[in-house]
UniProtKB/Swiss-Prot annotation:
It is found in: Cytoplasm. Belongs to the DapB family. Keywords: Amino-acid biosynthesis, Cytoplasm, Diaminopimelate biosynthesis, Lysine biosynthesis, NAD, NADP, Oxidoreductase. NAD(+) binds at residues 32, 73-75, 98-101. This is 4-hydroxy-tetrahydrodipicolinate reductase. The active site is at residues 133, 137. One of its GO terms (biological process) is diaminopimelate biosynthetic process. Catalyzes the conversion of 4-hydroxy-tetrahydrodipicolinate (HTPA) to tetrahydrodipicolinate. (S)-2,3,4,5-tetrahydrodipicolinate binds at residues 134, 143-144.
Length: 239
């Protein structure tokens, strides 16, 4: 499979390493404005986008207009997500966006959703989310933490939203910390006066995120439509 890397920072370099180990070719690396390049010159099967928030929408939609499917893990641009989906459909392309491509995190999402459903009737428990990342992470809270909060909100009609740090009783507080050399740790805590229930996912390196993105690209090749990591996991578990 021929892969384009949209963004060639640490994550892009890790994706390159894993892609080559899985016998794929990196045929294009973007580290400037995508409009400086003619994507038709490169025989791209799938593009993997880990760029920056201000460039993500243009990178993604430019690929759609060249009939190139896109796997995107860039966070912080989701105000334009609905528009990107519409352009994908219009151009008959394919798209997977995920706040986190780690296969382990996506299992964690499934656990979070199930736990939220179990806890929604237990009014003595309050819930909060903590995320810790490296100092270079630009967005706060993380996209993964927001996804966790959204899953809880879907299961609990008494909660109305989330807030960074301080929150009202009907909101989920998300505590975001930035520390040296932390790839990503997320904890969801339910606490009462009697006990505390926690689920935690701790990333040990970028390898898990990068592997998941490559697996998603393998899934997306030759498809059209909008997909999620649930589709990718279902395909993996089926096999």
């Amino acid at each position: 499979m021929n892969i384009a890397l949209l963004g060639y920072g640490r994550m892009g370099q890790t994706i390159e390493e894993i892609s080559k180990n899985r016998d794929h070719k990196i045929v294009f690396k973007l580290d400037d404005d995508i409009e400086n390049h003619d994507l038709n010159d490169f025989e791209i099967d799938v593009a993997i986008d880990f760029s920056v928030p201000k460039a993500a929408f243009k990178n993604i939609t430019t690929c759609f207009k060249h009939a190139i499917p896109v796997v995107s893990g860039t966070t912080g641009w989701l105000d334009d997500y609905a528009k990107a989906r519409e352009i994908c459909k219009k151009e008959d392309s394919a798209f997977i966006y995920a706040s986190n491509f780690s296969l382990g995190v996506n299992v964690f999402f499934e656990l979070n959703q199930k736990l939220a459903g179990m806890m929604q009737g237990l009014e003595d428990y309050s819930v909060d989310i903590e995320e810790i990342h490296h100092l270079q992470k630009l967005d706060s809270p993380s996209g993964t933490a927001i996804t966790l909060a959204q899953q809880i909100l879907e299961q609990n009609s008494k909660l109305k939203g989330w807030q960074l740090d301080e929150a009202d009783e009907d909101e989920i507080p998300i505590h975001a910390k930035r520390e040296e050399n932390v790839p990503g740790t997320h904890t969801v805590t339910y606490e009462s006066s009697i006990d505390k229930i926690e689920i935690t996912h701790t990333a040990k390196s970028r390898q898990g995120f990068a592997l998941g993105a490559v697996v998603a690209a393998e899934y997306l090749k030759d498809k059209t439509g909008i997909f999620t990591m649930k589709d990718v996991l279902s395909d993996l578990f089926k096999n």
